Amino acid sequence: MISPSFRKGMLKERVMDLASQTTILPLLFGCLGIFSLFRLLQRIRSKAYLRNAVVVVTGATSGLGRECAKVFHAAGAKLVLCGRNVKALEELSRELAGSSQGQTHQPFVVTFDLADPGTIAAAAAEILQCFGYVDVLINNAGISYRGTISDTIVDVDRKVMEINYFGPVALTKALLPSMVERKQGHIVAISSIQGKISIPFRSAYSASKHATQAFFDCLRAEMEEANIKVTVISPGYIHTNLSVNAVTADGSRYGALDKNTAQGRSAAEVAQDVFDAVGKKKKDVLLTDFVPSMAVYIRTLAPGLFFRIMASRARKERKSKSS
């Protein structure tokens, strides 16, 4: 037989549980509401910062660059679209102009090849002629690589470095004096998680992104007094044609959408993250899932473990290719 005191205790416990639930749930929803409001206010501030800003996007014909162009245009930015394919750039310019809702800024198109150092000075001059100045430079264009170090000809290493590192550096240096003169500007480098950690069979690509990270970190420190912001963005895998267009050990096109790239985030999502990072004037942004993010910390805090993991990955990948 249950005693009255026991029943009273059970009833009291249930009442306390109910009270705690009625207290916690509103508190939880309140916190979520405050967080959502905070994110909304940040996005409004980002749009205000970038409205009417002159934004240059390299590699704008496809993938992340194309999506960045859409996001920044929708926010009211004045765009300069850069790339090699003039037809694709002009089509994008018309598409953006046609999608405008009260937007009056017709995007300009400037064609040049980052792999050709001789074209960059003239391209920078043409970019400056579009609106007279540049507020934001997004160094997005790049090329990926697949291959073993032992089989890769050095011309491939040079090509990847030219497009991913020397080209963006040259363009940045060409546009930098006008920013310094105005005491205003924002330079964005689209790097990669592979600019922070190195994985097997990506040597040329990873080396170019490590160089990118180092250069723009130095630039950030040197340009602080000139009021020029520098943001390095390091995404993980993005579902684009980057792997399809990657160069291989002998210089030929890889021509395949590999599994990790196919499972990557959409370019539209990452472009929105790029927009937010620029609007918030962030310095260094890692856009990856939990495991790659942890790999960055493991590389720093437990390098021996990281090296063993990468060696194991290399063995598995080599075995899968030979089977």
UniProtKB/Swiss-Prot annotation:
Cellular component GO terms, alphabetical: endoplasmic reticulum membrane; membrane; nucleus; peroxisome; transcription regulator complex
SUPFAM superfamilies from the UniProt entry: NAD(P)-binding Rossmann-fold domains
Any one biological process term the GO annotation gives: regulation of cold-induced thermogenesis
Record: active site: Y205
EC annotation from Swiss-Prot or TrEMBL: 1.1.-.-
A Pfam family it matches: adh_short
Function, in words: Putative oxidoreductase.
Binding-site residues for NAD(+), renumbered to this chain: S62, L64, Y205, K209, T240
Transmembrane domains' residue ranges: 18-38
Enzyme class: oxidoreductase
Cellular localisation: Endoplasmic reticulum membrane
Main localization category: endoplasmic reticulum
Organism the protein comes from: Mus musculus
Entry protein name: Dehydrogenase/reductase SDR family member 7B
Gene name in the database record: Dhrs7b
Binding site for substrate: S192
Membrane topology: Single-pass type II membrane protein
